[in-house]
């Protein structure tokens, strides 16, 4: 904890890309089975915030985006999401809002409203102030 | 039972400190002066002194309890030590050798030194040189990458914790030959070299504020601007750190009211209580004001919430002044910038504390509370 942060992720960008590939396949299959929440959780898991590689971040974003757009029941989804996911989900929501693409923004805004109710302003704060771990 | 006394001294209070007998309070009403008020009765305060020496806003005040000296630091890069001679406060300039504003100050537990955090990425440790009748400042120039927002002394009078806007909390040794005596059972040689960094904590990704040591010096607590509060137990070669994320707006300052309970104050205008349970896990308990306790969803779960609910369910809050308290249910209208204990420094438990806030109906308030573990009489 103190001092150098342990880089659990492999520094190798290729390895991360490969992992994202397998993740996206898993998510596709989960979505086919209407397991939307599972899909989102899988997408958010292992998000590579510590890599500086833009490609990895973009690749992961595409996967998360897919899962976010598939969500229909927001309340239910947030009910089954545990607290650790709130912060990372919020970061992806802001990334979604920054795209300016209408359906994405609409979906992201709806989730944002509900998520803020649950997680509070602190969650947004953590998103905004964290410039080292961006998504 | 938490009882709150509210006193309005000014539009906005930058910082404040209490006299040793708690009858007087020195505060900066967001200008270049320090006003000292004496309490004549429950609600009646009389302004006794106005200390005017600084050219810019006074950013830190500390009043030593044994030697009865006030130290003030200001954005004008100066510091004055005020001594009461007769009925007047006489200032002594302390040349800090800073080229940026001084942000915070604290007397050491033995009151023979004081530490000043500054925007010049340095910490000044000032001590009194008897031969020259002069306060000398020694700078810790290394390590800090940005402004030092807060300083806190360990009970052993040598270790100093600092927080900075680079997000890190550091512990330094401020051993000064001639002022500090080498403790025979003291730690490593690093602890006896001035300016030596003992520990650096890299828990926060954003600005860090408000560091404090627990009464025994075993635990450190500080806050990050990302609505997080960090607790570090067993500060030393292998510390145990915990990050607690909470729902609402960030905190600015914290106070240990006992070894296992911390009050945080900040942008929510409502002090928050954090406590450690028996296993040593810290978590958010509740707000002090009449506000529904936040869900423990965002902080790691605690078994305490229910127990506290029973004790504080019948809380009655009486305010003496009439503020338009907003929907948050707190007494302050705007963000609270500092929290100061009322009582002898170094005592293991704090029964009362005061908070001061910015702008619009800001006021320091005394908050009396009964510790729920031990039944003691209110002072």
Curated annotation (Swiss-Prot), chain A:
SUPFAM superfamilies for this protein: Arp2/3 complex 16 kDa subunit ARPC5
GO molecular function: actin binding
Gene3D superfamilies, A to Z: Actin-related protein 2/3 complex subunit 5
Pfam families assigned to the protein according to its UniProt record, in alphabetical order: P16-Arc
Subcellular location: Cytoplasm, Cytoskeleton; Cell projection
Domain of life: Eukaryota
GO biological process terms held by the UniProt record: Arp2/3 complex-mediated actin nucleation; regulation of actin filament polymerization
Claim: Metal-binding is one of the keywords in the record: no
InterPro entries reported for this sequence: ARPC5 (IPR006789), ARPC5_sf (IPR036743)
GO cellular component: Arp2/3 protein complex; cell projection; cytoplasm
Keywords: Actin-binding, Cell projection, Cytoplasm, Cytoskeleton
Assembly notes: Component of the Arp2/3 complex composed of ARP2, ARP3, ARPC1/p41-ARC, ARPC2/p34-ARC, ARPC3/p21-ARC, ARPC4/p20-ARC and ARPC5/p16-ARC.
Family, per entry: Belongs to the ARPC5 family.
Function: Functions as a component of the Arp2/3 complex which is involved in regulation of actin polymerization and together with an activating nucleation-promoting factor (NPF) mediates the formation of branched actin networks. Arp2/3 complex plays a critical role in the control of cell morphogenesis via the modulation of cell polarity development.
Name the record gives this protein: Actin-related protein 2/3 complex subunit 5B
Gene name linked to the record: ARPC5B
């Amino acid at each position: 904890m103190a001092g150098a942060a342990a880089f659990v992720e492999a520094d190798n960008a290729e390895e991360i890309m490969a992992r994202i590939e397998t993740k996206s396949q898993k998510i596709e299959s989960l979505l086919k089975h209407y397991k939307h929440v599972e899909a989102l959780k899988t997408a958010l898991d292992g998000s590579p915030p510590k890599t500086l590689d833009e490609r990895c971040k973009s690749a992961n974003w595409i996967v998360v985006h897919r899962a976010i757009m598939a969500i229909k029941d927001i309340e239910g989804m947030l009910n089954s999401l545990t607290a650790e996911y709130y912060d990372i989900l919020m970061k992806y929501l802001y990334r979604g809002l920054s795209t300016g693409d209408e359906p994405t923004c609409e979906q992201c805004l709806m989730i944002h409203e509900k998520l803020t109710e649950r997680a509070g302003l602190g969650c947004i704060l953590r998103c905004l102030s964290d410039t080292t771990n961006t998504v | 039972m938490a009882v709150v006394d509210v006193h309005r001294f000014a539009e906005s209070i930058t910082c404040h400190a209490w006299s040793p007998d708690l009858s007087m309070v020195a505060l900066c009403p967001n200008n270049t002066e320090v006003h000292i008020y004496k309490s004549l009765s429950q609600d009646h305060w009389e302004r006794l002194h106005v200390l005017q020496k600084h050219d810019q806003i006074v950013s830190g005040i500390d009043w030593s309890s044994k030697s009865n000296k006030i130290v003030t630091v200001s954005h004008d890069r100066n510091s004055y030590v005020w001594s009461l001679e007769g009925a007047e406060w006489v200032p002594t300039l302390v040349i800090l050798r800073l080229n940026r504003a001084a942000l915070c100050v604290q007397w050491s537990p033995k009151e023979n030194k004081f530490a000043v955090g500054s925007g010049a990425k340095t910490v000044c440790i000032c001590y009194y040189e008897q031969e020259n009748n002069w306060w000398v400042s020694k700078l810790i120039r290394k390590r800090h990458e940005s402004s030092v927002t807060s300083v806190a002394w360990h009970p052993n009078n040598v270790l100093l914790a600092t927080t900075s806007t680079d997000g890190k909390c550091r512990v330094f040794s401020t051993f000064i030959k001639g002022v500090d005596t080498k403790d025979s059972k003291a730690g490593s040689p690093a602890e006896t070299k001035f300016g030596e960094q003992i520990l650096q904590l890299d828990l926060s990704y954003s600005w860090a504020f408000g560091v404090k040591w627990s009464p025994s010096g075993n635990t450190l607590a500080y806050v990050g601007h990302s609505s997080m509060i960090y607790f570090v137990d067993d500060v030393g070669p292998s510390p145990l750190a915990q990050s607690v994320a909470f729902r609402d707006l960030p905190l600015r300052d914290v106070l240990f009211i006992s070894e296992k309970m911390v009050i945080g104050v900040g942008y929510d205008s409502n002090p928050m209580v954090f406590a450690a349970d028996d296993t040593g896990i810290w978590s958010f308990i509740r707000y002090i004001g009449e506000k529904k306790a936040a869900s423990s969803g965002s902080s790691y779960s605690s078994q305490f919430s229910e127990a506290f609910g029973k004790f504080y369910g019948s809380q009655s809050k009486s305010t003496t002044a009439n503020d338009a308290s907003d929907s948050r249910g707190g007494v302050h209208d705007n963000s609270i910038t500092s929290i100061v204990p009322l009582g002898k420094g170094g005592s293991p438990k704090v029964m009362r504390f005061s908070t001061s806030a910015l702008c619009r109906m800001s006021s320091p308030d005394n908050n009396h509370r009964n510790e729920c573990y031990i039944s003691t009489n209110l002072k």
